[in-house]
From Swiss-Prot:
Keywords on record: Cytoplasm, Protein biosynthesis
Classification via InterPro entries: Ribosome_recyc_fac, Ribosome_recyc_fac_dom, RRF_sf
Protein name (Swiss-Prot/TrEMBL): Ribosome-recycling factor
Principal location: cytoplasm
Gene that this sequence comes from: frr
Record function comment: Responsible for the release of ribosomes from messenger RNA at the termination of protein biosynthesis. May increase the efficiency of translation by recycling ribosomes from one round of translation to another.
Record-level Gene Ontology MF annotations: ribosomal large subunit binding
Secretion signal, residue range per the UniProt entry: none
UniProt similarity note: Belongs to the RRF family.
Coiled-coil features, chain-numbered ranges: none
């Protein structure tokens, strides 16, 4: 039973970590990255399509993204979706491709991005701690109902705390790497 709780804890915390990674993937560093455009949705064909479903995105150099739209009839909608994504990007249409030259990040922009990054990290840490709290309450109920022994209770609390600490270290490590990318590139 405790093994199931431990597994459930790891799974829930892993989902939180993956969500954090997805959040920070869209934060721009000084380098061009195709993942910068992952969250963009294009309104075409009477519905919504992710950009990577209607075009291929490649990096040509450190500052340039090249978007090859597969259906030239929707290139205007793709350009508008990029403009409306509030990423401070200026797409230029060249035939059936769109070129985006990323502007240099100002110090003010870098600081704003780092602040946003810290906000994502803190939200992830809070989510991890909330998962820990829920699991600890579940373990305490089991101990009160005599479903587990006192020793198992204390061992489980220790293991859950270790899992929590490991996941918070992952968040802090990724935060540090991304922060250095933003500030130093």
């Amino acid at each position: 039973m405790l093994k199931e709780i431990k597994t459930k804890t790891k799974e829930r915390m892993l989902k939180t970590i993956q969500s954090f990674y997805n959040d920070i993937k869209g934060i721009r560093t000084g380098r061009a990255s195709a993942s910068l455009l992952d969250g963009i949705v294009v309104n075409i064909y009477g519905g919504h399509q992710k950009l990577n479903q209607v075009a291929g995105v490649s990096v040509t150099d450190n500052k340039t993204l090249l978007i090859k739209v597969w259906d030239i009839g929707v290139i205007g909608e793709v350009k508008n979706a990029i403009l409306n994504a509030n990423l401070n990007l200026n797409p230029v249409v060249e035939g059936n491709t769109i070129r985006i030259v990323l502007p240099d990040l100002t110090q003010e922009t870098r600081e704003r991005l780092v602040k946003l990054l810290h906000q994502f990290a803190e939200n992830a840490r809070v989510a991890i701690r909330n998962i820990r709290r829920d699991i600890m309450e579940e373990i305490e109920r089991m101990q009160e109902n005599k479903k587990i022994s006192e020793d198992d209770f204390h061992n489980a609390k220790k293991e859950i705390q270790n899992i929590t600490d490991d996941n918070i270290k992952k968040i802090d490590g990724e935060l540090s790497i991304k922060e250095k990318d933003i500030l130093n590139y």
